[in-house]
Design a protein with these regions (language model features):
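Generic domain-boundary/flexible-linker signal
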Residues: 22, 44, 52-54, 98, ...
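Active-site proximal loops enriched in glycine and acidic residues that flank catalytic Cys/His/Asp
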Residues: 37, 45-46, 58, 71, ...
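Loop/turn-rich, solvent-exposed surfaces of beta-rich toroidal or solenoidal domains
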Residues: 51, 68-112
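Structural motif
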Residues: 2-12, 49-56, 96-103, 150-158
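N-terminal leader/targeting helix
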Residues: 38-68
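Multi-bladed beta-propeller domains
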Residues: 6, 12-30, 57-74, 105-128, ...
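Conserved beta-propeller blade repeats
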Residues: 1, 21-44, 71-90, 120-138
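Blade-level signature of beta-propeller repeat domains, shared across WD40, Kelch, NHL, RCC1
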Residues: 127-166
Length: 166
């Protein structure tokens, strides 16, 4: 399509000095990844002959498994909360231009919505405002970036201390 930019990404790990390179995901579709621990990376991708989704990769191996099937169904800005029991994620704007940050409880598969944030039409393309949810050091608060009324981009603080009780 005219005007559309296309790119492919592969996930490669290596030592801090650039040695010991390993192509962990050669699909060309790797996006939004986070280390869960020193051996595992969670990433949105579409491995060959598989459906798109969040996959957990074991570094330096071909081991991977799709997680969050049927719950975390869209690419987003994922991160593990302290303790790795919860994943914090968001969505891109839906048809109504609403973005949805949420928590996902890994063991139970429960999804906890954290709010609905309007992304006005002028915040599109390179000028978009992704929520990019991030947590406080103790994991009790989340901050998201989102336009608010006519005030432009704002940071919104969400208390999640009660959300994490299963």
């Amino acid at each position: 399509q005219s005007g559309k930019v296309s790119f492919k990404t592969r996930m490669i790990t290596g030592s801090i000095d650039g040695s010991d390179l390993y192509i962990l995901d050669p699909s060309g579709a790797t996006s939004h990844f986070i280390w869960r621990d020193p051996q595992h990376i969670l990433a949105w991708t579409q491995p060959k002959d598989k459906r798109p989704g969040f996959y957990l990769f074991k570094d330096k191996t071909s081991e991977m498994e799709q997680i969050t099937v049927g719950v975390m169904t869209e690419n987003g800005h994922c991160t593990y909360l302290p303790g790795n029991e919860w994943i914090l994620n968001d969505t891109y704007p839906d048809k109504q231009r609403i973005q949805h940050p949420y928590l996902f409880h890994v063991k139970s598969g429960k999804k906890v919505p954290l709010g609905d944030f309007l992304s006005p039409a002028q915040y599109a393309g390179e000028w978009r405002c992704d929520t990019h949810p991030r947590f406080s050091n103790d994991g009790s608060m989340v901050v998201v970036d989102s336009p608010y009324e006519d005030k432009g981009r704002q940071l919104h603080l969400i208390d999640i201390s009660n959300c994490k009780k299963i």
